Amino acid sequence: MKNINPTKTKSWKSLKKHFLNINTTHILDLFKQNKYRFLSFSTIFNNEILLDYSKNLITEETINKLIDLAKECDLPGAIKSMFQGAKINRSENRAVLHTALRNRKNIPILVDGHDIMPNINTVLEKMKIFCQNIIQGYWKGYTNKNITDIVNIGIGGSNLGPHMVTEALTPYKNHLNIHFVSNIDGTHLFEVLKKINPETTLFLITSKTFTTQETMTNAFSARNWFVQKITKSSSFNHYEQHISKHFIALSANPVEVKKFGINPSTNMFEFWEWVGGRYSLWSSVGLSIMLSLGSNHFESLLDGAYAMDMHFKNTPLNKNIPVILALIGIWYNNFFLSETEAIFPYDQYMHRFAAYIQQSNMESNGKCVDRNGYPINYQTGPIVWGESGTNGQHSFFQLIHQGTKMIPCDFIAPVLSHHPIFDHHDKLIANFLAQTKALAFGKKLEEITQEYITKKQSYIYDLNILPFKVFKGNNPSNSILIKKITPYTLGALIALYEHKIFTQGVIFNIYTFDQWGVELGKQLADDIYSILKQTNINPQYDSSTNGLINYYKYWSQA
């Protein structure tokens, strides 16, 4: 990829001038100027997903200038490099090929001169056979009972993706109970262990390196719990054989897997260094998804993602959904300086989607050094957050409607509900539509005054409160309407956001696929842990950290 500072491009300077012209425009005026604005600013993917981006502070000129920026930053070349397996993650000297995991046409993809597709296909087939054996009851626990519970132990991408997908696709799940443990807080593991039977539980230890502190702490504790349980009812001499029936590793490090006590040749499902953790649900990390849904639905998830991959790779930029969303995000982040964006899925099964995209985006593009190693003097990744509708409406929408901050929003909703109870879904969608309309157009003082006069309410009294009922509007949003949340459409939606994040990273001139910012905290935690365990050593840090350590030691011994 080319290293181009976006602020030095002609298109960036042109956008700055354009911003001065559009900054005082109201979305309401844009709709008045073009009664066909919806048609001009919407696009459909595979007759399954509709993107309406008309309720944004943009014109055709805005989009054209943003596309010029993408071209000047060589986005087309970057897309090509990623799909071809070039080592675009130069800070770690790695290719970025989560797209290869859903390469449904099986087109050869070379890394260091070797086609990686045979290995991908081998692992996928191994996953399918294994899941079939678990689901159909052929794989037995150490007391010859069927597996009933799956516990996925992992953190970050090894947890958020699989957890989100299994929740989002709950209507498609089978009889297996899926549990997720991520937090190193022992309470998380404790509460899961209370619910399960060691005779019928399968643990998935999910870690690329098999050295992640949180994951391995939980994994060792789970193994110890399991061994303690089986020694009460079985010969301790056979515990390694029993572990082989109840512990599976999902990792790229067979050496550490073996040290833990899992046989890599039989009980490990491999994934590779060119798979980033937050983009890994498509790999063996998604084993919990396949166990929950079955292999057919897992492959439908891959199919949907592949379809979006092809859309992203082949569609012109002005009709390319991930590119459009990415460019609009840059428009607000870097010119309006909005700093944040919110995601609101109006589907309760999708309640973990915002948290998943939060990690994908903020860990990817939360960078302050460009690809040349120089400090950045412009905004990069936004703060991403959200909540499922309509819960958010009764929580923080007040600030979005009448606060002082611009918060661009993505509203996501299915047309068809999996559970159409009475008129619930129509009311849900009515709220979805009402919020996007209210945010964009607001409500003027004159309208509110006229309403009070028409209703013959106490006008003299109400004059005092009318200003508090004014909605300024002009709050931008995208509406993503999905025909139905299925494995296919969810796969496409996830890939859409992945490619949006990639596009923004290219234009920001940063390395999207590393996460060095996570490392310092890990190193310090290891140092501090050793001090916490030794009562006779005084900490030698700053006064704040020293004081907190001393109080922790004092209170923990009380």
Curated annotation (Swiss-Prot):
Keyword annotations from UniProtKB, A to Z: Cytoplasm, Gluconeogenesis, Glycolysis, Isomerase
Subcellular location field: Cytoplasm
Residue ranges crossing the lipid bilayer per the database entry: none
Gene transcribed to yield this protein: pgi
Chief place of localization: cytoplasm
Name this polypeptide is given: Glucose-6-phosphate isomerase
Recorded family membership: Belongs to the GPI family.
GO cellular component, one term: cytosol
